[in-house]
């Protein structure tokens, strides 16, 4: 059962009920709290575009608690974060793994955070192929291309050399929030919201 809390807000015109995500959106907060697929990406992209159109000068906060997911869906979110004018601040709550960690590192420089007990994990893309030898070869070339692209972008966002990223993403690489800060995925570990 998927229960989404409702918030009641008192206004001069009476009461208004919001689902919690709509209420947070009013404060320019977006929650990425699930695996990343096309539907989730479309929702995040829509929220980013809406907030950018509403006020292009005001920061947007993207809270991430995600095990990762689809590369193309994640890149749609990434490209939109870079495309819009407002800075997108990223905050890891819980876990940012795989594409979740990639998006965490893609936040505006100086505005990438994690809470103290968060865990961050980077690795190379996962994939599988079946079918004729030619189809397997095409799939293998594509995943190698995507791996190189993701490594280059992650190197740019962390300040690490591409060779270090290649080595460190060869297998699942789990980090504490402090280690992710040292690595350049985030800028600071937060213990309180007013430290942001």
UniProtKB/Swiss-Prot annotation:
Localization: Cytoplasm
Provide a Gene Ontology MF annotation, just one: ATPase binding
Q: Which SUPFAM superfamilies match?
A: ClpP/crotonase (SSF52096)
What highest taxon heads this organism's lineage? Answer: Bacteria
Class in the EC hierarchy, top level? hydrolase
Its GO CC terms are: cytoplasm; endopeptidase Clp complex
Q: Which GO terms describe its biological process?
A: protein quality control for misfolded or incompletely synthesized proteins
One Pfam family of this protein, by short name? CLP_protease
Gene3D superfamilies, A to Z: 2-enoyl-CoA Hydratase, Chain A, domain 1 (3.90.226.10)
Give the active-site positions.
98, 123
Catalytic activity field: Hydrolysis of proteins to small peptides in the presence of ATP and magnesium. alpha-casein is the usual test substrate. In the absence of ATP, only oligopeptides shorter than five residues are hydrolyzed (such as succinyl-Leu-Tyr-|-NHMec, and Leu-Tyr-Leu-|-Tyr-Trp, in which cleavage of the -Tyr-|-Leu- and -Tyr-|-Trp bonds also occurs)
- Its primary localisation, in coarse terms, equals cytoplasm
**Disulfide bond positions:** none
Entry keyword set: Cytoplasm, Hydrolase, Protease, Serine protease
Q: Subunit comment for this entry?
A: Fourteen ClpP subunits assemble into 2 heptameric rings which stack back to back to give a disk-like structure with a central cavity, resembling the structure of eukaryotic proteasomes.
Q: PANTHER family attached here? A: ATP-DEPENDENT CLP PROTEASE PROTEOLYTIC SUBUNIT
The job of this chain, per UniProt, is described as:
Cleaves peptides in various proteins in a process that requires ATP hydrolysis. Has a chymotrypsin-like activity. Plays a major role in the degradation of misfolded proteins.
Record protein name field: ATP-dependent Clp protease proteolytic subunit
Q: Which organism is it from?
A: Geobacillus sp. (strain WCH70)
Tell me the organism's taxonomic lineage: Bacteria, Bacillati, Bacillota, Bacilli, Bacillales
């Amino acid at each position: 059962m998927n229960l989404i809390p409702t918030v009641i807000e008192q206004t001069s015109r009476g009461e208004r009920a919001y689902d919690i995500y709509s209420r947070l959106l009013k404060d320019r907060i977006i929650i990425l709290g699930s695996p990343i697929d096309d539907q989730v990406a479309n929702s995040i992209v829509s929220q980013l575009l809406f907030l950018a159109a509403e006020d292009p000068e005001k920061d947007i906060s993207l809270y991430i608690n995600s095990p990762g997911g689809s590369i193309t869906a994640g890149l749609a979110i990434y490209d939109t974060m870079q495309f819009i004018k407002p800075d997108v601040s990223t905050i890891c709550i819980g876990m940012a793994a795989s594409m979740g960690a990639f998006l965490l590192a893609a936040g505006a420089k100086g505005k990438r955070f994690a809470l103290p007990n968060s865990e961050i994990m980077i690795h190379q893309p996962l994939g599988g192929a079946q079918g004729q030898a030619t189809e397997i070869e095409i799939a293998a070339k594509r995943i190698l291309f995507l791996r190189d692209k993701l490594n280059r972008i992650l190197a740019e966002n962390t300040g690490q050399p591409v060779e270090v990223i290649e080595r460190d993403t060869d297998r699942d690489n789990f980090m504490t929030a402090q280690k992710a800060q040292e690595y350049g995925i985030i800028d600071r570990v937060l213990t309180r919201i007013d430290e942001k």
